[in-house]
Amino acid sequence: MAGEITETGELYSSYVGLVYMFNLIVGTGALTMPKAFATAGWLVSLVLLVFLGFMSFVTTTFVIEAMAAANAQLHWKRMENLKEEEDDDSSTASDSDVLIRDNYERAEKRPILSVQRRGSPNPFEITDRVEMGQMASMFFNKVGVNLFYFCIIVYLYGDLAIYAAAVPFSLMQVTCSATGNDSCGVEADTKYNDTDRCWGPLRRVDAYRIYLAIFTLLLGPFTFFDVQKTKYLQILTSLMRWIAFAVMIVLALIRIGHGQGEGHPPLADFSGVRNLFGVCVYSFMCQHSLPSLITPVSSKRHLTRLVFLDYVLILAFYGLLSFTAIFCFRGDSLMDMYTLNFARCDVVGLAAVRFFLGLFPVFTISTNFPIIAVTLRNNWKTLFHREGGTYPWVVDRVVFPTITLVPPVLVAFCTHDLESLVGITGAYAGTGIQYVIPAFLVYHCRRDTQLAFGCGVSNKHRSPFRHTFWVGFVLLWAFSCFIFVTANIILSETKL
C-alpha cells in the first residue's frame, strides 16, 4: 500500500536489486511499444525513447533522495522519542537535572546536525521502507496528499483496465484464429473486425466479452481478500517473460537475416507521437515501487551508478525489441500485443511456440491483476481514512473492492484498444507519477532537510541533478506533455 512504512524485508545485493528493477520496468508496456514505434517513425521513436528514459532516470534519483530524507526524519524522531522516555523515567528533578533539561531545550532549537555525536550512524541511510504515500504525508500538505492519492488511483485504474483488456484480447485473437478458416493464426494480410465470426454465430467481440466475463469471475474475487505474489511465482513469471522476449527477438532477427523482413518504417510521422509518448512513459514507470526495491539493497554505496546502468540496459533492450519488430513486420500488420504477430505459420512453424507466445501474456498478466487490484483498494482506504477511525464491515469488505473492480472492467468491456489505453494511462496519470510527484517530493524534502538539519548537512543519496533548475525543468516538461497530448487528442477527434 502506498501509505505505509513497512518492514525492510530480506536483504539482497545491489546486482540482485538491479535485476528486480529491470523486471519491474520491463513489463506489459514493452509489448505495445513496437506498434507505437512503427506508427511514429523510427527516428522520432528513438529520440523520444532516449529522452524519456533520461527523464525517468532523473526523477528516479529524485525519489531516492526523498527516501533518504524521509529516513533521516524518522531517525531523528526515534532519537527524540528515546530522550522523552528517558526523561519520563528520571526521578524528581534536581538542580543538575534542571540544568541538563535547559541544555537539551537549547539543543532542540539548534539544527539537528549540531546535536549529533561523532560515530553515530548516518541519518540519511535508507534503512526503513517508506512508501511514496508516507513520503507525501511527510512533505506535502493535505491538498498535496489528496492529489498524490488521486494520481496513484487513476494510474492503477488504467493499469487494471489494460490488464483486463489484454488477457481477453489475447485469448480472442488466438482461439478465434485457430478455430476459424485460418488454423495458423493471424495472417499478414488478414484484417479482422470485431463483427467477424469467431465460432458459429458468435462474433469476435462476443468472444472477447465472454473471455472478459470469465476473467472477471475468476480473478475479481481476489480483490475482496488480501493476496501477495510469492517469490516462486515471481521467478516463474519472470522466466516465462524473458523466454518469450528472447524468442521474439531471435525469430525477428532470423527473418530479417533471411531477407524476409517486411517492414519499411517511416523516418518520422508526428501523428503517432501521442501514443508513443504515453507508451514510453508507461514503459519506464517504476517510481511508485522504488521504496520496495531500493530499501532491501544491502550496499547502497554506488546506487546512482547502478540505477543508471539499469536504464542503459533497458534502453538497449527496448531499442532491440522495437527495431527488430518494425523491420521484420509491416507497420499495418503489427498487433497491439506484439506477441500476437508470432501466431503466424510463416513466422513460427512450431504450434507449441505459437501458442506459448500468443498466450504468455494471459498467465503473466493474470498473476499481476489481483496484486494491483488489492493495492488500489488499499489506496482507496488510505485516502478516506481518518485517524483512529475504522470502516464498517460493508464499506471495508464490499464497497471498496467493488469500486476497485467495476470501473476497469467497464472500460475493458467498451474497448480493447491496448495502444490507446496504454498511451492515455501513461500520458496523464503516468506523467503525474513519473514527473510531477517526484519533482515536488524532492523540492519539499530539500527545504525541510535544510530547515531541520542546517545548511551544512549533506544527503549522501542526493540526486546528481541537485540544482533547482532540474526540478523546474521536469515540471515544465510534464506540463508541456500534458498540453501536447490533450491538444493532439482534441485535434484527432475533430478530424473524425
Curated annotation (Swiss-Prot):
Recorded superkingdom: Eukaryota
Subcellular location: Membrane
A GO cellular-component term linked to this record: membrane
Transcription listed as a keyword: no
Transmembrane segments: 11-31, 37-57, 147-167, 205-225, 234-254, 277-297, 307-327, 355-375, 398-418, 422-442, 471-491
Disulfides per UniProt: none
Protein name stated in the entry: Transmembrane protein 104
Topology feature Cytoplasmic, residues: 1-10, 58-146, 226-233, 298-306, 376-397, 443-470
Annotated gene: TMEM104
